[in-house]
Each structure stands twice: as structure tokens, then as C-alpha cells.
């Protein structure tokens, strides 16, 4: 959520910044128009309340009953007008809030300009893609041949874009989650295990609403929402709190399944497990002082890259351009791993600084020093990593000519002695 004071005091700067992402300046003008209405109504309400207070004091001193009754009737009309204005004010404030929540975050000045993902900039690449002496298979062929991915039964259970992991495939998924959580603990993140359903207020605080409403699953009867990412519950751990400066930075990691309707991806990536309605992810999340947030973004990126490195996966890091930047982000790095069976790079982590955009919506503040006025924290989030794309990359990079898949060394302690997945 953007700062209304910034919009009010520097509208041209806000329009120019949002214009880099394709936002129509009329959206900013709408917020300003509601803001002026709201302030005009507030002025009128305050003037009438001041008048009522002054006249009330006069009435107490009046000896003429007729004159006093006339003043009382006059003030009753003033009270009715105040009540009417309060209703108008509430409606305008609701409209202004809705317009404000439609505005995305401002991109950082350093973010490269560009209309779409083709303008993203590769800033790092590590690990040489493996050279095969056979034609590598895509993961869906490997998974079915090894009997570790069952697409048919996934569809039978839940419909399209669902699947079942079996035997060592299910164990490999679990091993990845446990290993990632252990790794991030060593990197300085405190593990939390949160609910997978949240109140609507949490969706607003994490800025999933209103933009992504059509992509979310909701229980209408109880007004609870399935989480699309652990970012949602973890953001709201400190909603409506004032943190002490010495608590910061707070760094968390969390595993959750993620639920997305994928309406915006209809017809894309229909084969395999690359894009599903339910998938697992380990998330890294930070609450930090504003002056340190871009240093923390570099740590977040380094920690995600280290995860890929330890798994032995070739990866590259991109900085996203303005046209591909997420709604809440000011700056984002995407980390992609090579999938030789499909011949493409797969995004497994997106590391973003959202500055105070979520904190302002969720009212998360900190006190820079004892007695100081509270300020909004900055928040950052990054996948560490997303599954099943990490699973895809392991299957395709570690496949052997006989169709078996070697388990990465770091995962073997979590695999109960399994070092190679073979068809049994």
C-alpha cells in the first residue's frame, strides 16, 4: 500500500514511477480526487463540531427559554448534518482505500526498464549444463517410467493440474523440504509452521487482494482463504504490532503447500508438474529496518543461490525489468535452474524487496529507539526453493542413460539410504 502523503505531496513523481510499469496516471488522479473529497468533508465536519461546541456553551448560559429552545433546535439540525457528513465521509474513505489498494508498488530507480520478461537482465550464471551422451528425457516421462509420478490418479482425485507423487518420488519431495528448512536455519532464519488457511484480512495485508482475487481459493462459508504462498501468513505474524528496533531483522522460513487457481495460465505448461493448482514451497521472509532492506535483499538472493548450488543444479539469476516486476515488489531477482529434458530454464526462486508496501497495509511498525515515533518496517520475501520445479530439475539433471535418477548428495541423509531411484 502506497503512502497517501507521498501521492498527495509528490503526485508527478508517483505518476512517473508507476508509468514505468505501465500504470495509467488516471489511477493516481482518482486517489487524489477521493483524497480531496475526504479532506473537504473532514474540514466541514470539524467546523460544524466546533460550532456545536461553542453554541452548547452559550446555551448553558442563556436565560431566555425561547431563545434557548431555538438554539437547541438549530444544534439538532447541525447534529443531523454532522451525521450525514460522517456517512458521506465513510463512503469516500472506502472508495479512496479501494482506489489506493489498486495501485502497485513503485519500482526502485535501479530497476531496468522494459515492457515484458524479454527485457529482464541476466546478472549471474553458475554451473555448466551437463552434456549428455543420450537424449535427456523430460520429467513427465521419467516420472511415469520410474512409477514415482501418477498423473492419471491425480486427475481422478482432483481434476486437471493435479498429480500424485509415489514411493521414492514422494520421499524425494519430503527430503527437499526438510533439507531446505534445515539449510535456512543455518543461514539465520527461524522456522515457523503456520496455518494453511487464513482470514481475508491476511490477504489484504500481504497485498494478494484485490489484484489476485480470481487466482485464489476461498471457503465462502467461513470466509477463509487457502494460502497461495507462505508469504501470506508469515507477513501477518506481526500485523498490528510495534516491534522493538533490537528485534530486527526478523528472518523466518516456512514450508506450506500453495494453492492457486492458475486462471491467468490457462493453456500454458499443461504437461508435467511445472504448473499445478497445489504445490509445495519453502519461503524465506524478513522484517527489517528500512535502511538495511537492500542489503538484506542481497542476502536473500545469496541464500537462494546457495540452495541451488548445494543441489548441484546449474542456475542463473535475473533482475526483473519494470514490465515483469510483481505487483508488490520494488526490486526482484529471479533464480532459474536448467531443465535439460525440457530444454528450458525454470524459475525456482523469486527474491523481492517490497519496502513498506505490505507493512503499511498490515500496520507493522517498529520503534527506531525508545520513545521514538513508530515507523513502518520493510519486508522481503524469497522462495527457498519452490517445488515441484526443483524436483523437475533434479530428475532431469540427474537422470542416467538407463532411466534411473541419482539422488543429490546433500539429500541422501534424508532419503533413508536411497541413493538412486530405479524402477522396481
UniProtKB/Swiss-Prot annotation:
Main location: cytoplasm
InterPro entries reported for this sequence: aa-tRNA-synt_IIb, aa-tRNA-synth_II, aa-tRNA-synth_II/BPL/LPL, Ser-tRNA-ligase_type_1, Ser-tRNA-synth_1_N, SerRS_1_N_sf, SerRS_core, tRNA-bd_arm
Record-linked CDD domains: SerRS_core (cd00770)
Binding site for L-serine: 229-231, 283, 383
GO molecular function: ATP binding; serine-tRNA ligase activity
The keyword tRNA-binding belongs to this UniProt entry's keyword annotation: no
Entry EC number(s): 6.1.1.11
Compartments, as annotated in UniProt: Cytoplasm
GO biological process entries: selenocysteine biosynthetic process; seryl-tRNA aminoacylation
Residues that coordinate or bind ATP: 260-262, 347-350
UniProt-listed PROSITE patterns: AA_TRNA_LIGASE_II (PS50862)
GO CC terms, sorted: cytoplasm
Keyword presence, Nucleotide-binding: yes
Protein keywords: Aminoacyl-tRNA synthetase, ATP-binding, Cytoplasm, Ligase, Nucleotide-binding, Protein biosynthesis
Domain notes: Consists of two distinct domains, a catalytic core and a N-terminal extension that is involved in tRNA binding.
Homology family: Belongs to the class-II aminoacyl-tRNA synthetase family. Type-1 seryl-tRNA synthetase subfamily.
Subunit annotation: Homodimer. The tRNA molecule binds across the dimer.
Function summary: Catalyzes the attachment of serine to tRNA(Ser). Is also able to aminoacylate tRNA(Sec) with serine, to form the misacylated tRNA L-seryl-tRNA(Sec), which will be further converted into selenocysteinyl-tRNA(Sec).
Name the UniProt record assigns to this protein: Serine--tRNA ligase
Native organism: Roseiflexus sp. (strain RS-1)
Lineage: Bacteria, Bacillati, Chloroflexota, Chloroflexia, Chloroflexales
Amino acid at each position: 500500500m502506497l503512502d497517501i502523503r507521498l501521492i498527495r505531496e509528490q503526485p508527478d513523481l508517483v505518476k512517473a514511477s508507476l508509468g514505468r510499469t505501465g500504470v495509467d496516471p488516471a489511477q493516481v488522479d482518482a486517489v487524489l480526487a477521493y483524497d480531496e473529497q475526504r479532506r473537504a468533508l473532514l474540514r466541514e465536519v470539524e467546523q460544524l463540531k466546533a460550532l456545536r461546541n461553542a453554541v452548547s456553551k452559550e446555551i448553558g448560559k442563556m436565560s431566555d427559554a425561547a431563545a434557548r429552545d431555538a438554539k437547541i433546535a438549530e444544534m439538532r439540525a447541525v447534529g443531523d448534518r454532522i451525521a450525514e457528513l460522517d456517512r458521506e465521509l465513510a463512503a469516500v474513505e472506502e472508495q479512496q482505500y479501494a482506489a489506493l489498494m489498486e495501485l502497485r508498488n513503485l519500482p526502485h530507480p535501479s530497476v531496468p526498464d522494459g515492457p515484458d520478461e524479454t527485457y529482464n537482465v541476466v546478472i549471474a550464471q553458475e554451473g555448466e549444463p551437463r552434456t549428455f551422451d543420450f537424449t535427456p528425457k523430460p520429467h513427465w516421462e521419467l516420472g511415469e517410467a520410474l512409477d514415482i509420478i501418477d498423473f492419471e490418479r491425480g486427475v481422478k482425485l482432483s481434476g486437471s493440474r493435479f498429480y500424485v507423487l509415489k514411493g521414492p518420488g514422494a520421499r524425494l519431495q519430503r527430503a527437499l523440504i526438510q533439507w531446505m528448512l534445515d539449510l535456512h536455519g543455518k543461514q539465520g532464519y527461524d522456522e515457523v509452521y503456520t496455518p494453511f488457511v487464513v482470514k481475508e484480512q491476511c490477504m489484504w495485508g500481504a497485498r494478494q487482494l484485490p489484484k489476485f482475487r480470481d487466482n485464489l481459493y476461498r471457503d465462502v462459508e467461513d470466509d477463509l482463504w487457502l494460502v497461495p504462498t507462505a508469504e501470506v501468513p508469515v507477513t501477518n505474524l506481526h500485523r498490528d504490532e510495534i516491534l522493538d528496533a533490537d528485534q530486527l531483522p526478523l528472518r523466518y522460513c516456512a514450508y506450506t503447500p500453495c494453492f492457486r487457481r492458475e486462471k491467468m495460465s490457462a493453456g500454458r505448461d499443461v504437461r508435467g508438474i511445472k504448473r499445478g493448482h497445489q504445490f509445495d514451497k519453502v519461503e524465506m521472509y524478513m522484517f527489517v529496518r528500512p535502511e538495511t532492506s537492500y542489503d538484506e535483499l542481497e542476502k536473500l538472493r545469496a541464500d537462494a543461490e546457495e540452495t541451488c548450488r548445494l543441489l548441484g543444479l546449474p542456475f542463473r539469476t535475473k533482475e526483473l525489468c519494470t514490465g515483469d516486476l510483481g505487483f508488490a515488489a520494488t526490486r526482484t531477482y529471479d533464480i532459474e535452474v536448467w531443465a535439460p529434458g525440457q530444454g528450458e530454464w525454470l524459475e525456482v526462486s523469486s527474491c523481492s524487496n517490497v519496502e513498506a508496501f505490505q507493512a503499511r497495509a498490515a500496520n507493522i511498525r517498529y520503534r527506531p529507539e525508545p520513545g521514538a515515533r513508530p515507523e513502518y518496517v520493510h519486508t522481503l520475501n524469497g522462495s527457498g526453493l519452490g517445488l515441484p520445479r526443483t524436483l523437475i530439475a533434479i530428475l532431469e539433471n540427474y537422470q542416467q542413460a538407463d532411466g534411473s535418477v541419482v539422488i543429490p548428495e546433500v539429500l541422501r541423509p534424508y532419503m533413508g539410504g536411497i541413493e538412486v531411484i530405479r524402477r522396481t
